[in-house]
């Protein structure tokens, strides 16, 4: 039994030995895993390195945790600081203005506001042509040299077969030798060329002659390119001087006001404002705006259509435009007359802009535009409306932020839905926010909301005209439907009492009389009661010489179903 157990144990012990043999054979056949085992085993054999690795993390752990805690605290403080620091709108605008000024300064130094001149382009094209010709000639020379070397190699191939076999065997194992192949080939070709010269000198002489015949154009063309480069480097680049509306850019506080307008037009996006400024400068140069202003040409036939008159309640100059004048065929019958009107309109705009005192921070640097749509041409005249859209777009792009408010009065019923549909296409959102539309019945109230009646021309419902009462204040009153309204003008002593009165909408009755304050005196009729129609003179001007204390009583009878607005002023002298 003991012998059997010994034999079994021996068999068991022998079993793993038998299994190890095929494994070792496999390991020997595959070289890569054996190398990995040897590389891994190298650090494991050093027993001294193990305790060092185990000790160092334990010592460095608290320091790392401390650094992490410090970094977290710093991040928390930064976050708190970011939450606390909030830039106001003025600070954001100042920062954007400084960035914009830097970009404008760089553009002036690089002369980016001037368009490239055509002669310079021609010179560049000539230089390019010469360079291309030289490149083509070099290519032809290289091709000829390649053909000559190929011929030499074909003739001498049987002489050196062993060298090529050695090259192919040496280039396979190492990648770096593949890069050195062209050098080796060059050496071989030179050796072959020397042998070829000994064998056949005639072919070499022919090749040299062909090469020499091509070389002279290189020496002739090369100095031309060098001369052009030297001329380009010799030209000094000076900063460009650009001015808009008579104000040079980046000179004083006036330019800050102008640059701020371009920033506001592009919502303080600096790069977009710079492109807008460049486009405006280019547009002014192409259309010769400065020369147009200096010419001083005035066309009286357009003055009835567009004119500047008075100021609004905030001090902005008001510019009135009458779209009904576009129906005049004598003025707007063809494109030439339309373009003539556009140039005159630009000239008027330039004069109004140049009259602004940009150095005064309290001065208003924008305008109020009042556009009268009474008797305006219908949508059937597409060419005319396309011209109007183009003109509006030009003013919006090249005169940014010069409109404080735009009032459209006497707007017909068809224009309101048209504007709601196509308004987003015609104008920008910023411009639409400044627009106010009013129909015929609400036009006067809309104007008087922004402009005082004494500043509004008589044509548009005001009392602004050259009279002795111009400096007097105007009083407004409302006459209710189917009611009378009386106005009393006192006279404390003997004097001459003058007054001006206007009823918006007409269709009322007007009368005036003098009533003395002393007993026993009789009333005196100054103006008999009469009806005022829409065709009558809109402004009633009257006066009375008072001989004793009393008052002038004016009676207005409104028998219509609509309320009426009355404007009047008076003066004693």
From Swiss-Prot:
Coiled coil: 89-157
Taxonomic path: Eukaryota, Viridiplantae, Streptophyta, Embryophyta, Tracheophyta
Family: Belongs to the patellin family.
Name under which the protein is recorded: Patellin-1
Species of origin: Arabidopsis thaliana (Mouse-ear cress)
Gene it is expressed from: PATL1
Pfam families documented for this protein: CRAL_TRIO, CRAL_TRIO_N, GOLD_PATL1_C
Subunit details: Interacts with the deubiquitinating enzyme AMSH3.
Record SMART domains: CRAL_TRIO_N (SM01100), SEC14 (SM00516)
Region (Disordered): 1-74, 111-202
Domain GOLD, chain residue ranges per copy: 471-572
GO CC terms in record: apoplast; Golgi apparatus; mitochondrion; plasma membrane; plasmodesma; vacuole
GO BP: cell division; pollen tube growth
Residue span(s) of domain CRAL-TRIO: 295-468
Matching Gene3D superfamilies: CRAL-TRIO lipid binding domain, GOLD domain, N-terminal domain of phosphatidylinositol transfer protein sec14p
Positions carrying Phosphoserine: 195
Job description of the protein: Carrier protein that may be involved in membrane-trafficking events associated with cell plate formation during cytokinesis. Binds to some hydrophobic molecules and promotes their transfer between the different cellular sites. Binds to phosphoinositides with a preference for PtdIns(5)P, PtdIns(4,5)P2 and PtdIns(3)P.
Chief location of this protein within or outside the cell: membrane
UniProt keywords, alphabetically: Acetylation, Cell cycle, Cell division, Coiled coil, Cytoplasm, Isopeptide bond, Lipid-binding, Membrane, Phosphoprotein, Transport, Ubl conjugation
Modified residues (Phosphothreonine): 29, 118
Further remarks about this protein from its record: 'Patella' means 'small plate' in Latin.
Molecular function, one GO term: lipid binding
């Amino acid at each position: 039994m003991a012998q059997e157990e010994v034999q079994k144990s021996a068999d068991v012990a022998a079993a793993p030995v038998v299994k190890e043999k095929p494994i070792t054979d496999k390991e020997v056949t595959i070289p890569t895993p054996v190398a990995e085992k040897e590389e891994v085993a190298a650090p494991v054999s050093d027993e001294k390195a193990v305790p060092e690795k185990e000790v160092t993390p334990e010592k460095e752990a608290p320091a790392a945790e401390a650094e992490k805690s410090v970094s977290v605290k710093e991040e928390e403080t930064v976050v708190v600081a970011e939450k606390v620091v909030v830039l106001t709108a003025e600070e954001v605008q100042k920062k954007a203005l400084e960035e914009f000024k830097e970009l404008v300064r760089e553009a002036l130094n690089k002369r980016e506001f001037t368009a490239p001149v055509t002669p310079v382009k021609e010179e560049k094209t000539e230089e390019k042509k010469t360079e291309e010709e030289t490149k083509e000639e070099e290519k032809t020379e290289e091709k000829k040299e390649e053909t000559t070397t190929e011929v030499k190699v074909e003739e001498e191939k049987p002489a050196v077969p062993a060298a090529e076999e050695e090259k192919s065997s040496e280039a396979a194992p190492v990648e770096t030798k593949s890069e050195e192949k062209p050098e080796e080939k060059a050496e071989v070709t030179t050796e072959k060329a020397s042998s070829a010269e000994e064998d056949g000198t005639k072919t070499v002489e022919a090749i040299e002659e062909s090469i020499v015949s091509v070389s002279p154009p290189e020496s002739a063309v090369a100095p031309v390119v060098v001369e052009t480069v030297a001329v380009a480097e010799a030209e000094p680049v000076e900063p460009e001087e650009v001015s808009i509306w008579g104000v040079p850019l980046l000179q004083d506080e006036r330019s800050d006001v102008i640059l701020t307008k371009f920033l506001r037009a592009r919502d303080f996006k600096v790069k977009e404002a710079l492109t807008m400024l460049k486009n405006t400068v280019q547009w002014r140069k192409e259309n010769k705006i400065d020369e147009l202003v200096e010419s001083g040409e005035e066309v009286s036939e357009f003055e009835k259509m567009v004119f500047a008159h008075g100021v609004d309640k905030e001090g902005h100059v008001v510019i009135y435009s009458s779209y009904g004048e576009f129906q005049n065929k004598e003025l707007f019958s063809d494109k030439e007359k339309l373009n003539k009107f556009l140039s005159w309109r630009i000239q008027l705009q330039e004069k109004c802009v140049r009259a602004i005192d940009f150095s005064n921070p309290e001065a208003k640097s924008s305008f109020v535009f009042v556009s009268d749509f009474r008797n305006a041409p219908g949508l059937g005249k597409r060419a005319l409306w396309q011209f109007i859209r183009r003109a509006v777009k030009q003013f919006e792009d090249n005169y940014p932020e010069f409109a404080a408010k735009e009032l459209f009065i006497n707007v017909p019923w068809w224009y309101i839905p048209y504007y709601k549909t196509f308004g987003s296409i015609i104008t920008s959102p910023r411009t639409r926010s400044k627009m106010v539309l009013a129909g015929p019945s609400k036009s006067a109230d809309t104007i008087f909301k922004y402009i005082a009646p004494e500043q509004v021309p008589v044509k548009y419902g005001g009392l602004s005209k050259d009279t002795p009462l111009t400096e007097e204040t105007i009083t407004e009153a409302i006459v209710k439907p189917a009611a009378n309204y009386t106005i009393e003008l006192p006279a404390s002593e003997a004097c001459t009492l003058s007054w001006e009165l206007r009823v918006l909408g007409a269709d009322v009755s007007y009368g005036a009389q003098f009533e003395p304050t002393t007993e026993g005196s009789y009333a005196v009729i100054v103006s008999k009661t009469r009806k005022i129609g829409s065709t009558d003179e809109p402004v009633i001007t009257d006066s009375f010489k008072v001989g004793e204390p009393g008052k002038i009583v004016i009676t207005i009878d409104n028998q219509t179903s609509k309320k009426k607005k009355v404007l009047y002023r008076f003066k004693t002298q």
